[in-house]
Amino acid sequence: MEGPLSVFGDRSTGEAIRSQNVMAAASIANIVKSSLGPVGLDKMLVDDIGDVTITNDGATILKLLEVEHPAAKVLCELADLQDKEVGDGTTSVVIIAAELLKNADELVKQKIHPTSVISGYRLACKEAVRYISENLIINTDELGRDCLINAAKTSMSSKVIGINGDFFANLVVDAVLAIKYTDIRGQPRYPVNSINVLKAHGRSQMESMLINGYALNCVVGSQGMPKRIVNAKIACLDFSLQKTKMKLGVQVVITDPEKLDQIRQRESDITKERIQKILATGANVILTTGGIDDMCLKYFVEAGAMAVRRVLKRDLKRIAKASGATVLSTLANLEGEETFEASMLGQAEEVVQERICDDELILIKNTKARTSASVILRGANDFMCDEMERSLHDALCVVKRVLESKSVVPGGGAVEAALSIYLENYATSMGSREQLAIAEFARSLPVIPNTLAVNAAQDSTDLVAKLRAFHNEAQVNPERKNLKWIGLDLVNGKPRDNKQAGVFEPTIVKVKSLKFATEAAITILRIDDLIKLHPESKDDKHGGYEDAVHSGALDA
C-alpha cells in the first residue's frame, strides 16, 4: 500500500468546495444586481491610486474589481465575454449564471449527481433557445427605423443618457447607418470601431453631435499650412519626420573640419529626401504618429501640404482602413532603398480643420474605401463623459446587432417569464432524471424580472406573479397568444404589452446571455476539488516535492 502524496498546499473537496464556489458567484452577482434595469443604481469604484470610476455597466464594474476567488473570476470573464461578443446584457448574464449555480447546488445537496444536473441544464438551454427563435422573435422589417430607435432607447434606459433617450437614440442609429458597407459575400456590415467617440466636458448632453467624417483631436503642424484640402491624398506614417541623428555610441573620426559640415548637411538631406519622395507621389495630407521638426514643416508649408503630428496609432489605423491607405513604419523596401509609391496613399474628398465646440479638430470627410462617422460628447465633467461613452458603446452594439440579425425580442422580463413557464411544462413531460434540473433552470430565469422590480422599488412577488400568470395564459390558450409580449412597466409598477410600448432587445443578446450563463454555471458546477498551492517562500531551500521526500511522506 502506498503512502499519501504530500501536496504542498490546501485541498478542499466535495460539497465544501461546491458551496464555496456558489457563494463566490452569488457575491459577485450581488455586487451588480442593484445596477440592473432602467432604475438601476450606479457604483463608484476607486482604484489603488485614487482614480474614480462611476458606472452601472456590469462589464466595467467587474473589470475594475480585483477578484481573488477562482470561481468568481469565471463570472468576471463571463461579463467581459458578453461585452466583447454582444456589447450589452453583461449584468443580466452574471445574475442568471449565479442563480443557476445556486439552484444546481440545492439539487446536488439532495444527492442528485452533478452530471445529471449538467445534462439537464444543457437540454433546458437548447430548448429555451429554440423556443425564443420560434415564438418570441419580432422581425425588424415590419417595424422599420422605429425598431432601431426603440432598441437603442431600451439599452440606454438604465444609463446616464437615458433621460435624453430620444436624442441619443437617433444619433446612435444615424451613426451606425452612416458606416454601413458590404463585405465580399454581399452581407451588410457595421464596424462600430469606425465610429470615433470624442469627449469634451462642458455644455449640456444635448449639445453632443454627430459628424459625418472621421474627427481627429489634432491640429495642423504649422500656422502657414492650408486649413482645407479638397481631393486629399493621405499618407499615413508611423515614424517621426525629424532631422536624422546618428545613434548613440557611433563614433566618427574626422581629420578635415569641412567634413563635419558635410555630415551635418547629410543628416538634414536624408529627411529632406524622404519628404520629397512622399510629396512627389501627390500626397497633400501627411499624418504621422511621431513628431515633425521645424525644418521638415518648412518643406510641407512650401509644398502647400497639410501635416499633422502626434496622431494616435489607433486613429491612424482607422483612417488608413477608411481611406484605403497603407500605414508605413519605414520607407525602406526589401532592397534597403527608401521608396514611397502612390498606391500607398489613401483618398478622401476633403480634409479640413474646423472649430467644433471649443476645440480645433481635423475632419476627414467622405473617405474612399469606407465611410466613417464621429460623435462628440458633451457633459458636465469627465466622470459623466466617460460613463456617456460606455453607454453609447452599448447602444451602438445593440443597433449593430439588430441590423445584422434583423430580429428583436420584447424586453422588461418578458422573455425570461415566457421561458420559465414553458420550461416548467417541458420538465413535466420529461421522464428522465433531467426533469428536476430543467425545473430548476426554469425557476432560475424569473430572477431577471424579480431584480428589475426590486430595483424599481416595486412589490416584486406580486409583479412577477402577475407576469407569469399572463404568460401561462398565452401558452395555454391559443386565442390569447398576444399576451406573450407582456413585460414589466417599472415606472407605473404593472405589466404591459412591451411590443406596443417599444421595449426591444436584440435576439442575440438574450440567446447569447442564456448560452454563456449556462456554460459558466456548468464550468463551475463540474468542479469538485480545489488544490491551492502555497507560494514557495524564498527562505525555503527545498521545494514542496523535496520537502515531501525528506519528511518520508513518499515512502511506501
Curated annotation (Swiss-Prot):
Chain sites annotated for binding ATP: 37, 89-91
Family as reported in the entry's similarity comment: Belongs to the TCP-1 chaperonin family.
Region (Disordered): 536-556
N6-acetyllysine: residues carrying this PTM: 199, 400, 494
EC number of this enzyme: 3.6.1.-
Protein residues bound to Mg(2+): 88
UniProt-recorded name of the protein: T-complex protein 1 subunit alpha
